[in-house]
C-alpha cells in the first residue's frame, strides 16, 4: 500500500488534488495489485503508465482501477513485465520538459526568454516575450501555478503555439505578448498537490505577495503593462470539468469586451460549450483578481477538465488564440 499525502500547508486545508507519481519495479509476468490510500482525501486522478521513462504514456483501462465506496482507497492493477514502470496521476510534464518546449518556441518565432526572478528554491522564473518596446497594447497569459494541472498546461501550449504562428505582422507591430509557462517550478519539481515549497497556494497569494515567485511575477507584469492597454489576461488551470472563471459581466469597473468575445468563440466552437462562472472567489488573492485590481483588465481563469480529451484541449487553446488575434485586429486604433 502507498499513502498519498499532501505537502505541508500553512494556510489551512489543502485543495483536494491527490496527485501521485512513482516508479514500480514489477519484474513479473503477472499483473500486480497496488492500493493507494488517500487517508482523508479522495481518489481524483486516474493512473497512467510509461515504460520508456516518461517519453510516452498510456492510460490504464477502466477495469484496472477499483475505488472504495468512501473514495479514500483505490486498488490499481498494474500490468506485468520485465521492466519498471512509471505510474502517475497524469502524464508527467516536468520543469525540464517545459524548458525544452519554451526553448523551441523562442527559437522558432524569434521570441525573447526573460528571467524575471527566482523561486523560493532558487529556480529561475522565466517569461517568453515578443513585440516592440514601443507597443501600445499587451496580452498576458500564464500557466503552471498548480503542479498536477497538466491539461491546463497543454492548452496553454496550444494557445501559445497558435498565437505565435498566426498573429499578423501588423498586429505584432503594436502589441507585446508576455507568456509565463511555469509560475510555480518548485511545486512541479517536488510533485506537490497544490503549493510551492513555502506551503502556500500561489494562486491565493497575488494580493498579499508573500512568496518570492509571486512578488517577482507581479513586479514584472506591472512593469511590462506600464503605459500599455492590457487587452487580455488569461491564466490556464485544470479542474473537474472545463469552465471559465470571470469577473461579473454586469459590473462596469472592467471592460468585458474581450471576455465576451472569448465566450462567443467557445460557444460557437465547442460542444458542449464550457460553463462561465462570474464572480468566483471575488475576494481571493487569485491572478484574475490581481489583474482586475492592478492592471484594470478582466482577468480570466481558463480551466480544463482533468481528463479533457486531446481534441478539447486543442480546441480551447486554438480558439483562445484566435479570439485574441481577432479581437486585436478588430480593435486596432481604438
Language-model-detected regions and their locations in the chain:
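A short, polar/proline- and glycine-enriched secondary-structure boundary/capping micro-motif
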Residues: 42-48, 97-100, 152
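Active-site-adjacent mobile loop/cap segments within catalytic or ligand-binding domains
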Residues: 92, 203, 244-252, 278-334
Amino acid at each position: 500500500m502507498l499513502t498519498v499525502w499532501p505537502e505541508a500547508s500553512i494556510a489551512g486545508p489543502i485543495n483536494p488534488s491527490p496527485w501521485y507519481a512513482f516508479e514500480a519495479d514489477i519484474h513479473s509476468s503477472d499483473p500486480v495489485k497496488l492500493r493507494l490510500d488517500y487517508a482523508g482525501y479522495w481518489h481524483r486522478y486516474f493512473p497512467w503508465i510509461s515504460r520508456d521513462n516518461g517519453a510516452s504514456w498510456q492510460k490504464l483501462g477502466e477495469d484496472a482501477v477499483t475505488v472504495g465506496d468512501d473514495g479514500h482507497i483505490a486498488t490499481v492493477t498494474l500490468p506485468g513485465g520485465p521492466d519498471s514502470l512509471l505510474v502517475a496521476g497524469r502524464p508527467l510534464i516536468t520543469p525540464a520538459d517545459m524548458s525544452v518546449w519554451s526553448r523551441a518556441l523562442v527559437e522558432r518565432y524569434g521570441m525573447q526568454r526573460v528571467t524575471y526572478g527566482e523561486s523560493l528554491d532558487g529556480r529561475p522564473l522565466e517569461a517568453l516575450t515578443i513585440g516592440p518596446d514601443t507597443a501600445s497594447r499587451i496580452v498576458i497569459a500564464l500557466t503552471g501555478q498548480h503542479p498536477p494541472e497538466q491539461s491546463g498546461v497543454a492548452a496553454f501550449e496550444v494557445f501559445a503555439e497558435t498565437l505565435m504562428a498566426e498573429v499578423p505582422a501588423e498586429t505584432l507591430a503594436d502589441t507585446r505578448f508576455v507568456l509565463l509557462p511555469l509560475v510555480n517550478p518548485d511545486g512541479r519539481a517536488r510533485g506537490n498537490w497544490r503549493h510551492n515549497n513555502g506551503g502556500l497556494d500561489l494562486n491565493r497569494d497575488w494580493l498579499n505577495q508573500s512568496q518570492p515567485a509571486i512578488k517577482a511575477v507581479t513586479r514584472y507584469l506591472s512593469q511590462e503593462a506600464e503605459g500599455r492597454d492590457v487587452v487580455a489576461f488569461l491564466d490556464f488551470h485544470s479542474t473537474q470539468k472545463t469552465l471559465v472563471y470571470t469577473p461579473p459581466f454586469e459590473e462596469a469597473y472592467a471592460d468585458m469586451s474581450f471576455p465576451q468575445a472569448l465566450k462567443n468563440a467557445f460557444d460557437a466552437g465547442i460542444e458542449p460549450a464550457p460553463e462561465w462562472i462570474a464572480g468566483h472567489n471575488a475576494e481571493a488573492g487569485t491572478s484574475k483578481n490581481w489583474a482586475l485590481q492592478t492592471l484594470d483588465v478582466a482577468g480570466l481563469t481558463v480551466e480544463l477538465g482533468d481528463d479533457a480529451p486531446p481534441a478539447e484541449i486543442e480546441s480551447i487553446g486554438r480558439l483562445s488564440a484566435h479570439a485574441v488575434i481577432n479581437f486585436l485586429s478588430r480593435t486596432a486604433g481604438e
